[in-house]
Amino acid sequence: METRNSDTGETRTFRARCIVNCAGPWVTDVIHNVAASTSSRNVRLVKGSHIIVPKFWSGANAYLVQNHDKRVIFINPYEGDKALIGTTDIAYEGRAEDVAADEKEIDYLITAVNRYFKEKLRREDVLHSFSGVRPLFDDGKGNPSAVTRDYVFDLDETGGAPLLNVFGGKITTFRELAERGMHRLKHIFPQMGGDWTHDAPLPGGEIANADYETFANTLRDTYPWMPRTLVHHYGRLYGARTKDVVAGAQNLEGLGRHFGGDFHEAEVRYLVAREWAKTAEDILYRRTKHYLHLTEAERAAFVEWFDNANLVA
């Protein structure tokens, strides 16, 4: 298989005994355009949009309310002083990479929340919106909310290397999906080992007894020079890998350039080195939510710095 880097134009050739097509919303594109194969199965895209607003209640409670159309809407505390509200559930037929929340969806979420709370949200309260597409296995049902959230495998062994196509799936069950997918490939890789993820923590989750509060106290003791908000940010986002982010720093100056809020150069370098961040947008919007805590000028200054720092090989 030959690949081309869309940023650099670099091409590479890969050879494999099997291909697992877990491209999500692009799964059928890979089947037809990359593997030059066919499948009777398909996915349908369902758009889910969210809005972020200033937190408008006291306390740490989260809420789940039912709208007039029977859909449930969550209202969660988010990033300290903000609230995350979602989601919509709308059939989507555009390009997955172009998905965005539209005004109708934003109004839908605001109206749903305002049915339950005394303090009414307004359009100008929306700080940010984002949207994603769920690649749901197309089981022929008309209502997007009724489409199965389960996943389906399709193993094609008719061509060269076997092609395992994954239709559907979601982030909360990705480990189970991966495990069962490997079971389907056992006859292709007879030396394959057994299952191992049942009690294996996620990266950064190597916390004794899963006791986060004790872990957080230890972090504060380990880095007494660090502001509590920064300790909280690192602890929640990176867990036991906080030490890799801090990288031996003994004071705030040791974390490198400060971009505003709890955003320091050491975190940027970690994300590029360990979490495949390639662009300033990757860091501000995807790996972190720093964009919510920086001014427009601070965001622009970071983008300019990153673009000239030559951190990405």
Per-range role (PLM):
Residues M1-S6:
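Short beta-strand segments that buttress and anchor functional surface loops
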Residues T8-C18:
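Core beta-strand elements of the Rossmann-like FAD/NAD(P) dinucleotide-binding domain
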Residues A23-G24:
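Glycine-rich, N-terminal phosphate-binding loop of Rossmann-like dinucleotide-binding domains
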Residues D29, V34-I85, I90-E296, A301-V312:
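C-terminal catalytic lobe of FAD-dependent flavoproteins
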